[in-house]
């Protein structure tokens, strides 16, 4: 199969960059500085990568004007303000897209479902009653859409995804393999030593330009809906419980868990393995560092941490012993000791005239 080639001047135009060098050069792909060959385009995202750039074999470089001055031995450049953003834009040029349309013969689709003529429905897909699939949407093999599910335009639903609970997806949503959208929320009423299941009557609403990774679970609401606003991005292995509301452009990394009825604001970042307790509210523009555990509301923007960083093993054991000892001492006793030490320091300063 012939590999698609793109001219350097065409690529520069796509990112609104300034071309320096030979615009007719042909490129077959993007590549890292380390592994690029003469038919590859690469990018330099900061001065710390200049040493690699100087020895790279790439045919052309996406750089800022300032970085170009450090590469006099190179000939071909696309000059932009943000090389990383330009790289992100060009990945879509070289990405291998699915161009098929139509419905595979092994798919099973309810007669009441409305499927766009420009959509693609893969092998063994099951689509239930009153479902809607929009223009140019791709649904890969073995995926299931239960009754009353709606999927908008230009979406990509990977293999083995289940969308249930009358969930509604807007446009340009991407969902990767083995994720479940709209599954039953974890709701039970305790009574006389037993758990009594609560039927989950809500749904899941997903906005435009949302990306959800593989093996995620996003549960439908008990009464109100679980909501992901526009631009939310979610890594693999994330659990979002019923009635959660996630604000626009929030990013959630792998292995995070968000308990029910919590509201997370806009433009937040949850790094890997964060946990958020239920019925909480997190303000806009909050960043949680890795392994943080949120147990109370966060009302102000900022960066918050509670995860413990790595220690050498013996150091860790000593630290834990000290923490346990500290926990055994009443806070009032610690305060009295600190007050006593402070009084002694002030007395010494006064005696020896140490204060300035």
From Swiss-Prot:
CDD domains: LbH_LpxD (cd03352)
Active site as annotated: 242 (proton acceptor)
GO terms under biological process: lipid A biosynthetic process
Pfam families: Hexapep, LpxD
Gene Ontology CC entries for this record: membrane
Keywords: Acyltransferase, Lipid A biosynthesis, Lipid biosynthesis, Lipid metabolism, Repeat, Transferase
Swiss-Prot/TrEMBL catalytic activity: a UDP-3-O-[(3R)-3-hydroxyacyl]-alpha-D-glucosamine + a (3R)-hydroxyacyl-[ACP] = a UDP-2-N,3-O-bis[(3R)-3-hydroxyacyl]-alpha-D-glucosamine + holo-[ACP] + H(+)
Residues passing through the membrane, by range: none
Annotated Gene3D superfamilies: 1.20.5.170, Hexapeptide repeat proteins (2.160.10.10), MurE/MurF, N-terminal domain (3.40.1390.10)
Listed pathway(s): Bacterial outer membrane biogenesis; LPS lipid A biosynthesis
Record InterPro entries: Hexapep, LpxD, Trimer_LpxA-like_sf, UDP_GlcNAc_AcTrfase_non-rep
Top-level EC class as recorded in UniProt: transferase
E.C. number: 2.3.1.191
Gene Ontology MF terms: N-acyltransferase activity
Family according to the record: Belongs to the transferase hexapeptide repeat family. LpxD subfamily.
Subunit structure: Homotrimer.
Function: Catalyzes the N-acylation of UDP-3-O-acylglucosamine using 3-hydroxyacyl-ACP as the acyl donor. Is involved in the biosynthesis of lipid A, a phosphorylated glycolipid that anchors the lipopolysaccharide to the outer membrane of the cell.
Record's protein name: UDP-3-O-acylglucosamine N-acyltransferase
Source organism (scientific name): Acinetobacter baumannii (strain SDF)
């Amino acid at each position: 199969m012939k590999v698609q080639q793109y001219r350097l001047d065409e690529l520069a135009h796509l990112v609104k960059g300034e071309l320096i060098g030979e615009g007719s050069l042909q490129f077959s792909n993007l590549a890292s500085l380390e592994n690029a060959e003469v038919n590859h385009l690469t990018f330099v995202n900061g001065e710390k990568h200049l040493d690699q750039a100087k020895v790279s074999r790439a045919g052309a470089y996406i750089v800022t004007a300032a970085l170009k001055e450090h590469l006099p031995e190179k000939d071909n450049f696309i000059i932009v303000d943000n090389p990383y953003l330009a790289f992100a834009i060009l990945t879509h040029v070289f990405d291998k897209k699915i161009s098929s349309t139509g419905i595979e013969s092994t798919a099973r689709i309810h007669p009441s479902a409305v499927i766009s003529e420009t959509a693609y429905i893969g092998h063994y897909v099951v689509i239930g009653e009153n479902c809607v699939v929009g223009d140019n949407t791709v649904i890969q093999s073995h995926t299931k859409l239960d009754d009353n599910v709606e999927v908008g335009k230009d979406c990509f639903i990977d293999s083995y995804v289940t969308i249930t609970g009358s969930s509604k997806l807007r446009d340009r949503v991407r969902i990767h393999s083995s994720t479940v959208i709209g599954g039953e929320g974890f709701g039970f009423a305790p009574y006389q030593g037993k758990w009594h299941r609560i039927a989950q009557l809500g749904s899941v609403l997903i906005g435009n330009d949302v990306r959800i990774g593989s093996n995620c679970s996003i549960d439908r609401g008990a009464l109100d809906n679980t909501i992901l606003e526009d631009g939310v991005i979610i890594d693999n292995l994330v659990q979002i419980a019923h009635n959660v509301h996630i604000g626009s452009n929030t990013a959630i990394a792998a292995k995070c868990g968000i308990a029910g009825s919590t509201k997370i604001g806009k433009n937040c970042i949850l790094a890997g393995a964060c946990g958020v307790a239920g019925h909480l509210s997190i303000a806009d523009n909050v960043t949680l560092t890795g392994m943080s555990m949120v147990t109370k509301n966060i009302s102000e923007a900022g960066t918050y941490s509670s995860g413990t960083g790595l220690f050498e093993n013996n150091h860790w054991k000593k630290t834990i012993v000290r923490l346990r000892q500290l926990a055994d001492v009443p806070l009032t006793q610690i305060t009295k000791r600190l007050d006593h030490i402070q009084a002694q320091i002030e007395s010494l300063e006064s005696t020896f005239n140490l204060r300035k």
